[in-house]
Amino acid sequence: MASQGTKRSYEQMETGGERQNATEIRASVGRMVSGIGRFYIQMCTELKLSDYEGRLIQNSITIERMVLSAFDERRNRYLEEHPSAGKDPKKTGGPIYRRRDGKWVRELILYDKEEIRRIWRQANNGEDATAGLTHLMIWHSNLNDATYQRTRALVRTGMDPRMCSLMQGSTLPRRSGAAGAAIKGVGTMVMELIRMIKRGINDRNFWRGENGRRTRIAYERMCNILKGKFQTAAQRAMMDQVRESRNPGNAEIEDLIFLARSALILRGSVAHKSCLPACVYGLAVASGYDFEREGYSLVGIDPFRLLQNSQVFSLIRPNENPAHKSQLVWMACHSAAFEDLRVSSFIRGTRVVPRGQLSTRGVQIASNENMDTMDSNTLELRSRYWAIRTRSGGNTNQQRASAGQISVQPTFSVQRNLPFERATIMAAFTGNTEGRTSDMRTEIIRMMESARPEDLSFQGRGVFELSDEKATNPIVPSFDMSNEGSYFFGDNAEEFES
């Protein structure tokens, strides 16, 4: 929990390590990404991919998905027990794209899961290397966060679509561990809890018996994870109430939705990590870079450095804008889907536009799309500056809430004001302050009302030149205070279909 004195850094969560010093953490994260890189190189050899094909992000995603599927114990067991027509539970595969006579062709490949597991373990010194698998899951999750909207999922659980900025990590699989829990947004945790409570309301046996006991433990654990994301005493006290409820029902759902709304201004601590596609690590390992010796961090300069020197390609549909495709992948690489566009634009050095203005669809290509008209382009993933990733919501001075915006969850530790429409947010809090949590609700509303949009978050924090790897000279950008900074403004993205 973030509240106890046992904070582990993301890197420790990512590598399953106990407390380590900075050098050990850098080494173990380095070991993790070099394992991913070695695995990727081996897969390219197995599939006889050319250098160009191996740098294609769509091929990287297929290979990543294959290894995640090969290690998905629960699904593998389920598939063996419920054989479905035409699905071999022991095999995994996907589309691989190859260049043939000046055209891109799609080839569906199939591999034994056992074989994939063997290659993965071999690349990771014989270990299962769960941390590396989680790392790939987080990269896929960050890509989904930048690509799709979750309006339907929000509405289904009774939440407001404008709360999209709280939904980081909403497509992460259940098995993503502590590193996964750290990057989940407040809205994601609330949605998982509401789904659980609804099942309990509809199914009398959900909380009963031996299974029910396990369910209850999972429920309390999720409540504790969410509690640890809140930074004010009143929000945490409300979470205690929700967790201790004998028979969670509609009152708890109400409380959770209230808390999610409050997080638009009293933001939660949500971790951000730059997780890159496997092919990027593969390229670096192939060029002789020794991650373990050099060390690596997901929250410092290293991912920026790596992207400065990597050439990754992407398939482009006929009417897509390659620059927009690059923006999408850049945001995914830095987990910046919910960051203020003013900050992202400054760091990237080119204007980052809201999603409603992007002429691009997702990175993955559906199996029914026509390959004849597909082209490929280099993704521009370089940046002008680098900045440290944050794990706080950017609330100003200690526990007092600062301004949040209807859709920002800061990614970079860079000074800015957080523009928000207080009237819009506060309108959601009229009325209901009675019941067991009334004093906490009143306290939370009071804190929100005293938040000022002109307050600075991350005071004195700046970005750094790419040559400044020790972060000695912060450059504090000045932003146009009034500017709308939301990526999801005027959104028209596709819904995420699980």
UniProtKB/Swiss-Prot annotation:
What protein family does this chain belong to?
Answer: Belongs to the influenza viruses nucleoprotein family.
A Gene Ontology CC term for this entry? Answer: helical viral capsid
Q: How does it assemble?
A: Homomultimerizes to form the nucleocapsid. May bind host exportin-1/XPO1. Binds to viral genomic RNA. Protein-RNA contacts are mediated by a combination of electrostatic interactions between positively charged residues and the phosphate backbone and planar interactions between aromatic side chains and bases.
Q: How is the polypeptide modified once translated?
A: Late in virus-infected cells, may be cleaved from a 56-kDa protein to a 53-kDa protein by a cellular caspase. This cleavage might be a marker for the onset of apoptosis in infected cells or have a specific function in virus host interaction.
Give the residue interval(s) assigned to the motif Unconventional nuclear localization signal.
Answer: 1-18
Q: Which InterPro entries match?
A: Flu_NP (IPR002141)
Q: What is this protein called?
A: Nucleoprotein
Q: Name one GO molecular function term.
A: structural molecule activity
Q: Where in the cell is it found?
A: Virion; Host nucleus
Motif Bipartite nuclear localization signal per record, residues: 198-216
For the keyword Ribonucleoprotein, the answer is yes
Which keywords describe this protein according to UniProt? Capsid protein, Helical capsid protein, Host nucleus, Host-virus interaction, Ribonucleoprotein, RNA-binding, Viral nucleoprotein, Viral penetration into host nucleus, Virion, Virus entry into host cell
An example of a Gene Ontology BP annotation on this entry?
viral penetration into host nucleus
Give the organism, scientific name.
Influenza A virus (strain A/Chicken/Hong Kong/37.4/2002 H5N1 genotype X2)
Q: What does this protein do?
A: Encapsidates the negative strand viral RNA, protecting it from nucleases. The encapsidated genomic RNA is termed the ribonucleoprotein (RNP) and serves as template for transcription and replication. The RNP needs to be localized in the host nucleus to start an infectious cycle, but is too large to diffuse through the nuclear pore complex. NP comprises at least 2 nuclear localization signals that are responsible for the active RNP import into the nucleus through cellular importin alpha/beta pathway.
| Residue span of region Disordered | 1-21
